[in-house]
Every structure is written in C-alpha cells, then in structure tokens.
A protein has these predicted regions:
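Short amphipathic alpha-helical segments
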Residues: 7, 67, 168-172, 204
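Mid-to-C-terminal secondary-structure elements
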Residues: 77-92, 100-201
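Hydrophobic, regular-secondary-structure patches
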Residues: 1-70, 74-80, 95, 112-113, ...
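Small-residue-enriched segments and motifs
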Residues: 69, 132-133, 206
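Peri-transmembrane interface segments
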Residues: 189, 200-218
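Residue-level detector of beta-strand face positions
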Residues: 59, 122-126, 207
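Short aromatic/basic micro-patch
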Residues: 29-32, 73, 104-105, 153, ...
Length: 218
C-alpha cells in the first residue's frame, strides 16, 4: 500500500442502509461521470487526477496455460495516479481508450503464470474468451494486500464493451497534488460526490479512503 504513494485516495461504494435501517432510500453507485467530476480543476484544485476502475474476476488463458485473476478496466491516467510503472513494454493511451482497443498491461504474477519461459509482449491472452494483446508488464509491487501483481489492466471501454457491460464502476482512484494536500483533496472529493449523489455525512453511499485508513483496513 505504501508503494502507491501517500497522496493516493480511493473511493468505493458504500451502502449506508444497515441492520434494516433505511438511512438513504436512494443509494447510487459510483459512475464514470463521478470520476469526470473529480477531475474538475476548478472544483477540485488539489486533485491531480482521478480514474474509474471496473473490476471483475476472469480466467485468462494463453495456449495451454490458464490463470484466474481480475481484470481492471480503467483510463490511461490510472498508471500515474496509482504509481504503477511498467517493467517492460508500454502503457495504453487515450487513443486506445477512445477506440476500445483490446490491449492490456499485465501484472508480474499473471506474466509468470501464463508466460513462464517467454516474453509476453505482443502475445495474446484470452480473458473469459475475449482476446487481448499484451503491450506491457507492470513492475512488481509486492505485498499481500489483494496482490497488486495479480491483475490484468485494460482500457475501460474495451472491458465494458466485451466483458462487463456498461454501468457502475467498482472504485475511483484519486491522486492529490501532493502529500501535503491530501486532506484538502479528500474534502473536495467528498463535497463533489455529496452534491452529485445528494448525500451528507451519515447518508453517504460512498467512502473515501486515504493511505492511513487503507493501512488500518489491511
């Protein structure tokens, strides 16, 4: 988690209706439009970037090898926001997102499982039967918290088109402009989402985590 950077925030859906008590009768999911709103430099001057994530479990295959993992559909800015460099190859870009290209950056665990003795770059993997071409391998992050190396990352548009369908997103990664502005960025994110979702403290259908709270959760 520490490798993600002290200026990372993570927004996830949260249902405030617990134990049979209806606190918010109109709970909303997180959407791509929420991520777009968080990128507003006027409303959120201390947010450097925000990227939606659509995550789902998949089984990926290459020739006679198979590996169960999760695919993350997201924007190109995800890599810089989450401090996720590649050790080989390249990232996908905005043109790839706009054209819904079926290309992927795979984590080191996936690379070792599907291509133990060969270079994965340029090779094709099928995730739930959908072909993706490997253009990059994410640098190893390590750690036992949700194994960040066991992942397949692809353009959000491609994942929605071919695997998940369209709708809500699983989370939004948010990068504050610096570690010193993380609290301000968190406040700006909450204010924007409160306005969009019609919520207040106690009825929020989302939760914002910072690095400290993520470490407590782990």
């Amino acid at each position: 988690i520490q490798s993600l950077g002290s200026n990372l925030l993570y927004v996830t859906p949260e249902n405030p209706n617990r134990d049979g008590e209806i606190v918010n009768p109109s709970v909303q999911e997180l959407t791509v439009d929420d991520a777009i709103a968080l990128n507003d430099p006027v409303r959120a001057p201390d947010i450097a970037g925000a990227a939606p994530e659509r995550r789902t479990a998949v089984t990926c295959t290459s020739e006679d090898r198979s590996h169960s993992t999760q695919i993350v559909g997201t924007w190109p800015s995800f890599f810089s926001i989450t401090n996720s460099p590649v050790s080989a190859g390249a990232y996908f870009n905005n043109a790839d997102e706009l054209s819904a290209r079926r290309i992927t950056v795979i984590g080191s665990t996936v690379a070792e499982s599907l291509f133990p003795e060969s270079d994965p770059l340029g090779r094709q993997i099928a995730c739930n039967g959908v072909p993706f071409t490997v253009v990059g391998v994410q640098a190893e992050k390590g750690g036992a918290f949700a194994n960040p190396d066991d992942v397949v990352i692809a353009p959000l548009s491609a994942v929605e088109n071919s695997i998940t369908g369209y709708g809500e997103v699983s989370a939004i990664s948010v990068q504050a402009s610096s570690s010193e502005t993380t609290d301000d960025a968190e406040g700006q994110a909450i204010a924007i989402l409160d306005e969009r979702h019609g919520t207040t403290e106690g009825t929020r259908d989302f939760e914002v985590f910072n690095q400290a709270s993520l470490l407590d959760t782990a």
